[in-house]
Amino acid sequence: MPVLSRQLLFSIAISFPVIASATNGMNMEGYGPISLGMGGTSMAFDNGVAAVMNNPATLSLMPEKKRLDVALGMLGPDVESSAGGVSAGSDGDAYYMPAVGWAKHYGEWTVGMGMFAQGGMGTDFSGNSFMGNPAQSAISPVLENRSELSVGRIVLPLTYNAGNNWHFGATIDFVWAGLDLKMAMSENQFADMANPASQQAGRTSGSLVDSFGAMYEPFGGTGVRSLDYAYFDYSNSSDYSGKARGNGFGGKLGFVYEVEKGFNIGASYHAKTWLNDLETDDANMQMAVNIDTGVAGGGAPSGSYVDSLIPLSGKMTVKDFQWPAVLALGVSKQVSERWQVAADIKRIQWADVMKNFTMVFNADNVASNGGFAGKEMTATLFQNWEDQDVIALGTAYQVTDELVLRFGANLSDNPVPDQYLSALFPAVTEDHYTAGFGYDFSQSDMVNFAISRAPEVSFTSASGITSTHSQTSWQLMFSRLW
């Protein structure tokens, strides 16, 4: 097989949109409609080429010699944030993601390739919402607050039927990630992050912060009486990729053991990713300040103040964003000729990768950036997510030779601590309830569909912003077997 270069893989990858919402934290609750319809269970039974995102060893259970799956999914989050008696709804309410996978048996071996959305999260609040003007300042900014994090994979699986009812599988994954962010911060947030004696929600440092601190009168400086807001902006209008991008690799291992006819045990391990930093050379930052007119003109303080914007251009780097390791164990039992039940338990190790969200802004060394030209700022938002345990339960009933019905539940806790909950990253959905069906048009052509509903949950951050989140999602897949 020809070796695809890292650059070619990335070019292919960004031509596919990937999701930006939250299910099990940022992970999807089910990959492929067969799994999703059964509550996200997938460790111990054949669930199509989506096995490359679940337990690759189940590809070895595929009864046909070759299989092609083509799928489309939609995630429909319903997110609202409120504070002080006002509320705002997110306009990001539908995210579509295609997927494709192919697998083929070669004797005891199975190979293939798949391209799937991994997960993400995001919101989109209008500039006309209460979030669009953090200080309710004289400057009317109408700031859009938007986040869209998306992660996808191209997966190359290899499985082996070792005999004696044992099946083993592994994958090599090319992983890409993209992030759009438009985020307004109030003066109180900035002061908390910049003051070493405070830093309850995050911290900021660097030569740019030092230069601003020398002007910021609440910190003993001269020239800036107040900061109405600071605004980070690196976002594009593409449905296919984020403004800040990175890529790297991951991998999975799995096994299935057929205890007896119709009763399987399976397990998998998804390794933590090795992604490089997400970067864009086209980022912007602006600060709305009440500044001394003399200082603003490059001279001595005049004692007269005016509202003004300080726009900066530069490079933004999101440091060390990774996807977590996942451990999963499951069973599947064919209770009767037509009735199957399955159960999985999964641990998603968010604590290892979501301790902090760190951005580094390097201002361009150009005249338009004034005294901040060439300066650097590191901003860290504390996250401190907890590891998440997920229990998936599912059942399938073969109504006729052509039609199978599926039902399931996916049960978990919110991994995001209330103290650090952000309206832009409300990955707080917990339980999901699912249903689906499969229909065989012939021995070689079939369709599978699943729908998932996450009831509304509500959490309030330490800053007093309440986020509510419910979600409806579906997946549709057409398959050809031969």
Model features per residue range: what roles?
Residues 43-46, 50-65, 102-108:
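Outer-membrane beta-barrel pore proteins
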Residues 40-47, 77-93:
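Surface-exposed strand-loop-strand hairpins of Gram-negative outer-membrane beta-barrel proteins
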Residues 23-36, 94-482:
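Outer-membrane beta-barrel porins/channels
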Residues 27-42, 60-78:
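Transmembrane beta-strand segments of Gram-negative outer membrane beta-barrel proteins
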Residues 21-23, 33-40, 47-48, 54:
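Residue-level signal for pocket-adjacent positions within structured domains
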Residues 68-83, 87, 119, 128-136, ...:
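A short glycine/small-residue-enriched secondary-structure motif
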Residues 1-21:
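Gram-negative bacterial Sec-dependent N-terminal signal peptides
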